[in-house]
Amino acid sequence: MSIGSLAIVLHAHLPFVRHPEYPDFLEEDWLYEAISETYLPLLLVFDRLAEEQVPFRVTMTLTPTLVTMLRDELLMDRYGHRLDLLCELGAREVHRTRNDPVFSRLAHFYREHFESLRGAFRERYKRDLVSAFRRLQDAGHLEIITCNATHGFLPLMQQTPEAVRAQISVAANHYRLTFGRDAPGIWLAECGYYPGVEKFLAAERIRYFFVDTHGVTDATPRPLHGPFAPIYTEAGVAAYARDPESSQQVWSSQHGYPGDPTYREFYRDIGWDLELDYIRPFIQPTGDRKNTGFKYYRITGKTQDKQPYDPEAARQQAAVHAGNFLFNREKQFEWLSGKMGGRTPVVVAPYDAELYGHWWFEGPWFLEALIRKVAFDQKTFRLVTASDDLVEHPENQVATPPLSSWGAGGYANMWLDGSNDWVYRHLHHCARQMVALTKDFPDASTLHRRALNQAARELLLAQSSDWAFIMKTGTMVDYAVRRTKEHLLRFQRLHDEIRGGNIDEGWLAHIEGKNNIFPEIDYRVYRPG
């Protein structure tokens, strides 16, 4: 009989990036890389485990923005073309390296890898990854949860409760339409919680959410079991805390598994290493270089001297690390089991899904090895979801978590500082305007309704926490600033045209086609009160 429960949570999210006005757009690569490196590999792992009847339970967030992009015909057409290019590059690399015994093996590995992904995308999954994830949920292997509609950071939106409610309500409705049931839980974007938000979750029949460790350990009154059991908020929604130990083993840049010298080096790619004339057809149309996914070196060490990558050695190391993770969880549960007053401890191990495959190429191999080892090599603990835990332990302590996030510093530092604070006065102003529009136009006519619905979309897209995060980290700042301003300006124009009664239907149709997220939205989700 097991004495512990491990809840693995994979948070899959990307901001809504769709540019039909350009034939090729660099930031769309975020999606294409994530499909090739994370979503397809994870699906193949989960399907293989299911077909071999290996028991497993994993929680996975599929955010509304990500689901929308994965179901968009234009983006899936473009991704299919990207796979064709990668397969062509694989064939060229096999020819280029034919006389090099080391790199020839790697070229063959990548050619077979991308051809396998292309076959899975087109033949196995029929270009519909969301339905593939849904089948795994319907079969009882995954528990898919939702997230704020556009990943808005709720603690910085609480000045307008209607805006918070809209982020949650739109997401919950989107989930019902996509998966045919209520969302059992929610990943609050960035684990961003503030006291009171749970009432909006309860209204949508959402039963649980996740917070960082201090979101539970610093709750009032102090929880008896620390981060190893959920607490109920006053609204009856359960809060689960991240376990710091299991997170550190994977996330830590200094001590985590992904830094092992055997693993693939993320920052060496032939898109940067090879002659420009050779690689030009596979990089940006401007001739600017970018990653291709063909990475021939392993981490090796902290210097620039890198040794060739060995996929088989890396796969074996992933299995070793899976065994180490298993051993550490067994010892953790053995230590906890006598300290919980009869309550089964639950260790919550949440990660960005993109860590598994994108940042850590071997991550899907690690996860598959871990799931197999949990199923067959031990009896100390089992894999669960939060829903499973609540069924087994329906009575839990009632407490109020503090405002918290899982970002650096644990609060709102990443999304509110000198690099991005300028956005909030505009976001708050537009949110108040949206509430007022809903009050003043409670039953709008067809054209006005379209404009009001699009105004709601533009506001939601402007609220994405990704833009403030990018401004803070300094990666693609110009794009993040541009997107924020574009959505705010579109909202303001729509607001003014609605108020003035002179809606430009041609322009409205244009932006409806460009930002086509949430076609089912009803602007009255912003109704006052």
Give residue ranges: language-model regions:
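Alpha-helical structural signal in soluble globular domains
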Residues: 45, 49, 136, 174, ...
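Gly/Pro-rich turn-and-neighbor structural signature
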Residues: 125-135, 154, 159-162, 166-169, ...
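Active-site-proximal, glycine-rich beta->alpha crossover segments in alpha/beta enzymes
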Residues: 74-138, 144-158
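A short alpha-helix capping/helix-coil boundary motif
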Residues: 21-23, 45, 57, 111-113, ...
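Short, solvent-exposed turn/loop segments enriched in Gly/Ser/Thr/Pro and often Arg
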Residues: 61-66, 148-150, 185-194, 214, ...
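Active-site and substrate-binding clefts of carbohydrate-active enzymes
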Residues: 2-57, 62-105, 224-529
